[in-house]
Swiss-Prot record:
Protein's UniProt name: Uridylate kinase
Reaction(s) the record says it catalyses: UMP + ATP = UDP + ADP
Source domain of life: Bacteria
Lineage: Bacteria, Pseudomonadati, Pseudomonadota, Alphaproteobacteria, Rickettsiales
Entry's EC annotation: 2.7.4.22
Length: 242
């Protein structure tokens, strides 16, 4: 462990956690042992002195784009997906607080009875007080992914880097689960991600990150302690930058 925060390159980070990461090997919902492991990884990073914000997806409960494909109005489907992210955020908050991690959930869709509305200044203040802020509700707008929300919130919070936790250990030129010969990139430019149509994030999210010079690091959440390792430039990952 690094006890001196000044020795760390990244002092304020945003972690993007997909809904799928929260369900483990299940087909739907939550796997609490997996969530507890993720919470433990987050605590390890907090103990380094790093300020942490989180954006959660909702794909383990509902995927708006899939519902739209079978005939549901896309905007309505996306709003339902945003509600799914709030469920995930509250679940993650509960598990994190069981580990004595001070946590606040801020939703882009106001739900005063269950969490705070997203206000940028309030979110920044929570982070300054070393609370973990979990952003829910996506951007609050339909037709926008939670990846776009992650990029926007990282920029708004002045984060040093966005870390995307996935099921694989980086960005590949094709799906490594389907193609055993898939080539892994250790670093790749925003332009090449867009040009090669790599499905690590949607094009809009990558474009906004590029415009604001926000580096993105993609790593596997499956291995215990990976979050802390990646923060310290260790382990397996891919960095997306200019």
């Amino acid at each position: 462990m690094i006890s001196d925060i000044n020795a760390l390159k990244y002092k304020k980070v945003l972690l993007k956690v997909s809904g799928e990461a929260l369900m483990g090997d299940k087909q739907f919902g939550h796997e609490y042992e997996v969530i507890k492991k993720i919470a433990g990884d987050i605590k390890e990073v907090i103990d380094l002195g790093v300020e942490v914000a989180i954006v959660v997806g909702g794909g383990n409960i509902y995927r708006g784009i899939n519902a739209a494909l079978v005939g549901m109005d896309r905007a309505s489907a996306d709003y339902i997906g945003m509600l799914a992210t709030v469920i995930n955020a509250l679940t993650l908050q509960n598990v994190m607080e069981s580990l004595n991690i001070y946590t606040r959930v801020l939703s882009a869709i106001p739900m005063m009875s269950v969490c705070e509305p997203y206000i940028r200044r309030k979110a920044k203040r929570h982070m300054e007080k070393k609370r973990v802020v979990i952003f829910a509700g996506g951007t609050g707008n339909p037709f926008c992914t939670t990846d776009s929300a992650a990029v926007l919130r990282a920029i708004e919070m002045n984060c040093d880097i966005l870390l995307k936790a996935t099921q694989v250990d980086g960005v590949y030129d094709s799906d490594p689960k389907k193609n055993p010969d898939a080539k892994k990139y250790f670093t790749i430019s925003y332009k090449d991600v867009i040009t090669n149509n790599l499905q690590v994030m949607d094009t809009a999210a990558i474009a906004v990150a590029r415009e604001n010079k926000l580096p993105i690091r993609v790593f596997s959440i499956k291995e215990q302690g990976n979050f802390a390792r990646v923060i310290q430039d260790k382990g397996e990952y891919t960095t997306i930058e200019e």
